[in-house]
């Protein structure tokens, strides 16, 4: 898979999310902030029958994602656009599954990592609002984020009618979790299952 210096690069969090998200045959899947298309590639490797749509604001990322899908002879749609305009870009409830590895750090947090890691172009609320619009009732939204933002994440999910149902922490051995994987259901009933952590050596 080709990567580019001005496009958010492949990381272990994307790998973890690609393995955590539940994907079923012939589902329509939306990747919010798709970057170079890595999550779509993971999911297509697991279930080739799905229909992947990637969305990214960065035109270089969109071009790279299209190249990566084509290089692997995979059929996917990649859209250049702002997820804050999801209502204009996609019909309501069009997707069975929405996935995202969004910016982690709130503006003003003191972290300096560019828009791919900082909430400069979109906030956690923006991501959840877009997912809540695009996913169908009973559909799923899978996201990876930072453990210290978990309360913010749960609040945003419920604000947009998505109920957290599955969760797994990701950590190095003998260290605190560095990431958390969450899958929420649109209009789901309360009841969260917490899985054993994924431990990285």
Regions found by a protein language model. Give the residues of each.
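Conserved SAM-binding motif I beta-strand of class I
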Residues: 51-56
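Conserved Class I SAM-dependent methyltransferase catalytic core
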Residues: 2, 6, 123-177
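Conserved SAM-binding loop of SAM-dependent methyltransferases across substrates and taxa
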Residues: 36-49
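Mobile active-site "lid"/loop adjacent to the S-adenosyl-L-methionine
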Residues: 102-130, 138
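Conserved SAM-binding loop
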Residues: 65-66
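A short acidic, Gly/Pro-enriched loop at the edge of an enzyme's catalytic core
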Residues: 89-97
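Conserved class I S-adenosyl-L-methionine
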Residues: 27-33
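Conserved SAM-binding strand-loop segment of SAM-dependent methyltransferases
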Residues: 73-83
